[in-house]
Amino acid sequence: MNIPKIPLAQTVILQCKKHGISHVIISPGSRNAPLTIGFSNDPFFKCYSIVDERCAAFFALGIAQQIRKPVAVVCTSGSALLNYFPAVSEAFYSKIPLVVLSADRPEHLIDIGDGQTINQQNVYSNHVVYNANLKLDIREESKLHELNIFNNPENKVVCFLSKQKEIDAYNKNEISIALNECILQSAPVHINIPFDEPLYETIASYNITISEDTDLTNSYCISDINNIDEAMVEWNNSGCKMIVLGVLHPDVIDNSLLASFANDPSVIVFTETTSNVHHPNFFPCIDKIIAPLESIEFKELKPDILLTFGGMVVSKKIKAFLRKYQPKKHWHCGFPNAYDTYFKLEKHFKVKPNEFLEYATKRKLFHSKSDYRKVWLNIRNHRRKYHKQYMDEIPFSDLKVFDQVLKRIPDNTHLQVGNSSAVRYVQLFEINPTLEVFCNRGTSGIDGSTSTAIGASLATSKNTLLITGDLSFFYDSNALWNNYTPNSFRIIVINNNGGGIFRILPGNKNTENFDTFFETKHELNASNLCDMYNFGYQCATNQKQLIDALDSFFNKSKNPKLLEIMTPSTLNDEILLSYFDFIK
């Protein structure tokens, strides 16, 4: 087995192995050659080669999102690591463990006009939980003159060994801290690694050792379950309680536990598509339920206590509702932090959701006099009735497409949804509860949805479908440039010839140069990209073509497939806005 000769490279590789980091995504370069050689020649690691660093980082994020363990990305020096930044910020806000291993030039070559060189240390400062800036090895006789000692050869050797030992200890400690923080906080870290030339020398086996001890004492997960008792007194005394679920993995909350806790006429549970929680007594499709409400209804329906679980919430309407008509108290349950999204955060229970629910259910009292849930149920049932009627009546459009597509997704599919309008349309429908749904809601960018979905498809046993818009798809089209996309992978692109969401936002259509600078109209289609990357391609421009295409789209195939659905950009916004009027 070829091992990089450079001790620092060996240290990084062995520390990753020690911490169980087995997935490594490598982008080509020379300065990172010691890491590339080491990772790719060690059978412990599953290595992927992705040229575009932005795609590589989102690809890694998709894997980490599914395995819920750190995944490493490796790049060369210079601007390469800046291309990781969108995925790093997404990982930071979505609490996904990502390890950035950036190769760097020696410190004496920084800011002197050397090529492919920038200030790499702490470059992600506000979006990682740890920065490890490693020290360059002193490993050559030619470097001995740099040591601050007398010109006695014996002293030079002693000083060399002592100095290198000191550097080794520092580097091992910094790497260990970074990887531990990545695991414990489920968040990104940056390890910057300076290498001097020569970069490609190898040896037959590792000549450094790493201690087996791994200190993973998690100070972030100290349960404060005893603090729930006091809160439950307030909970039981309140007649209007609302639970809102944000982004959650499918197995984080036990549906039956939550249903038992919420089995009370004074409690309602709002879920989002990305909550991955389903129960007949819960309230999915938040926007559908609350968007048509009038001010007087909002005042009457505001909760006394808001309890939240999970990560980011997609619905802008629930955020607007609870910020204007604020609850008296907002409590959040979960690790590691709580966002004051509604400006009323009072308590943060650092407890696993199921642990909280199991403990709190035993202490809750049935609030028989409240009609809070009954009022909401009447609203929900009314919306459902008119939603179905509207779907039956509307012509071919974005909304109609989502209605037809979501009905036909096979059971147990892993569904990735693009940002902007795609995820908002999906939120209007009560989807098949066997689906697992994910979306990059940490920063809500359109830039890496396809790369994330492809990465995720390699880390799940389920068939993966990505539903995305045209701008998001074309923006991240380099995601298709890889050798790993499984034949079962499917993409549905809703192409409305631009950023359709800007037609929905108030006022923008009347802005000068709206088509060019907001909607960014285009006449592109995905057929040539599919030819280039060996995807099966289908296109639908009306409902009959769509239904015919969907009949075979999910069948087994020798290649991944893409279905492009062309919708009328000038009708989509009118149909959606009329929808909220119709279901009132």
Spans of model-derived segments:
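Phosphate/pyrophosphate-binding active-site segments
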Residues: 1-4, 141-158, 162, 320-421, ...
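Active-site diphosphate/adenylate-binding microenvironment
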Residues: 9-13, 20, 27-31, 35-36, ...
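A short, small-residue-rich loop immediately preceding and capping a beta-strand
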Residues: 22-25, 46-48, 66-105, 302-310, ...
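N-terminal cofactor/phosphate-binding cores enriched in small/glycine residues
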Residues: 4-91
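Glycine-rich, anion-gripping cofactor-binding loops and their flanking helix/strand elements
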Residues: 83, 245-331, 432-461, 474-478, ...
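Thiamine diphosphate
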Residues: 101, 108-130, 140-147, 425-584
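Conformationally flexible catalytic loops at phosphate/diphosphate-handling active centers
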Residues: 3, 149-165, 172-177, 181-237
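Glycine-rich, acidic loop regions that bind phosphate or pyrophosphate groups
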Residues: 102-175, 270-379, 484, 506
